[in-house]
Amino acid sequence: MANNLESNISQIVLKKFLPGFMSDIVLCKTVDRQLLSGEINSNTGDSVSFKRPHQFKSERTETGDITGKDKNGLFSAKATGKVGKYITVAVEWTQIEEALKLNQLDQILSPIHERMVTDLETELAHFMMNNGALSLGSPNTAIKKWADVAQTASFIKDIGIKTGENYAIMDPWSAQRLADAQSGLHAADQLVRTAWENAQISGNFGGIRALMSNGLASRKQGDFDGAITVKTAPNVDYLSVKDSYQFTVALTGATPSKTGFLKAGDQLKFTSTHWLNQQSKQTLYNGSTAMSFTATVLEETNSTASGDVTVKLSGVPIYDEKNSQYNAVDAKVKAGDAVSIIGTAKQQMKPNLFYNKFFCGLGTIPLPKLHSLDSAVATYEGFSIRVHKYADGDANKQMMRFDLLPAYVCFNPHMGGQFFGNP
């Protein structure tokens, strides 16, 4: 039956738009999209909170008598999701109308959903880069051997992450450099493949799914220098950080009066404090070397005239003697501890990402229909998208707009991070 161009146009266009949009996404498929579903809407404001899981400690005794022992407390903790900015593509109605008449709607819609997916996945990549606390490899060293990929699976397993899929996301050039190991490449014989299928380098390599993406975020390192140490020991007991998994620390020894001394995405290494396996609470080792705790800068910060820097970090060296089941590290960060900044000052880079599916979450706000007879909203596999036909009276034009409003949450910064190759 021919398309009726007089009514329900937005609904017709939306039905065509959604499958193409889903076919284009890659990065969005690797993070949790269910926990945000139904929790955040147009009435929740700019944030929404999610409950973090409880952890418990065990008592080891000779007789089983736990008289006088501290019992596990139930502490309610939350992760807070933030609503982003609208992603909107507006086009003149005449383009859509002509495509409908000629049965060429797919060709017109393709660049629209490609643009929306690109914006969405680049913003998601920035969010993930700035929130993941883990760090592997040598900055700006290319991924060129499968051992560079396998290190991510080793770290995720060793730190005690057991549930959900694990991913290593690399730029497209990494696939070329890994192409000599043909047995590791993902293969499929279908003629038409989605962006997800085309992105796969390896379906499962040592417990990690290797994917390529052109949506990874690039950044420039801060203008840092100096022998950095902790000036004041931060408060990192569980009750102080449970709702954010972020902390602020005062450092000293920086080059004085530097604007942009640290930038968002920079990673700090606390060399005297080491990661624990989150289940067994044993110190992590790579060979004979204990793995130092790392955290990621959330906001750009300057150094003072006296060489001090106060920085907000994602990832927390939790050390709580009373609630040790939540400990992330083997020792408390102390004043005087050495801190190194990973990488080179003012270095341009595009980090690869590795993480567990439950590191971050993505959702979209169900948007209300605009005041019009021709406005459609649909939720499809966790994505809510609005299509609206309207008139621009001032410009004397008929228009159609496509809208999506994303929301992002970091459930646990200790479940993801940046990685590079090794020299």
Curated annotation (Swiss-Prot):
Please report a single Pfam family linked to this protein: P22_CoatProtein
Q: Where is the composition biased (Basic and acidic residues)?
A: 56-67
Q: Name one GO cellular component term.
A: viral capsid
Subcellular location(s): the record lists: Virion
- The segments labelled Disordered in the record are 47-67
InterPro entries hit by this protein: Phage_coat_Gp5 (IPR024659)
Keyword annotations for this protein, in alphabetical order, are:
Capsid protein, Late protein, Virion
Q: What protein family does this chain belong to?
A: Belongs to the P22 phage major capsid protein family.
What is this protein's function per UniProt? Assembles to form an icosahedral capsid.
Q: What is this protein called in UniProt? A: Major capsid protein
Give the species: Acyrthosiphon pisum secondary endosymbiont phage 1 (Bacteriophage APSE-1)
Give the source lineage, highest ranks first: Viruses, Duplodnaviria, Heunggongvirae, Uroviricota, Caudoviricetes
